[in-house]
Amino acid sequence: MTAGEYELAGIETIARGICVRGGRLLVCRAKGSATCYLPGGHIEFGETGREALAREMREEAGIDVRTGAFRGVVENSFMQHGAKHAEINLVYEMDAGEGEVVSKEDWIEFGWVGLGELGEAGLLPEAFRALGADAGARFEA
């Protein structure tokens, strides 16, 4: 590849949470999108991944979550709206409590997907599917 093919705005560092309740995984999606992803968001300078995950859930869903064990790192490169993107996802266990998880943002929505249906639900990147499917037996909230 040429240097121009690697031009990116930067590699994004993102904290993501795996929250399983009743055999279902909490996911987030842009409204109208056929794909979904684990909830979370960008880590700001000076934050830990756990702090960023808790902050993002407060901002996006208005809830306080408990972050748990570190589950892994997922690299992801993709095209979006004609632009190259690259991200490093730090994935943590997350407990969102017993209440409903509703977006405070007008462009995203939260939902629950059965652990056996992560592929059909369009969970991306695909590496999240293995982490999510493994989650049910290991740390259901």
Briefly describe each language-model feature range.
Residues M1-R16, G22:
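Acidic, metal-coordinating catalytic segment for phosphate/diphosphate chemistry
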Residues E7-I11, G82-I88, K104-W107:
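A generic structural micro-feature
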Residues E12, V20, L38, V65, ...:
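Short connector loops at helix/strand junctions that flank enzyme active sites
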Residues R21-E59:
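Conserved Nudix-box catalytic region and its N-terminal flanking loop in Nudix hydrolases
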Residues D64-V73:
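A short coil-to-beta-strand element that immediately follows conserved catalytic motifs
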Residues E75-E100:
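Active-site-adjacent beta-strand/loop module that shapes the phosphate/pyrophosphate-binding cleft
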Residues V91-E93, V102-A135:
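NUDIX/MutT-family hydrolases
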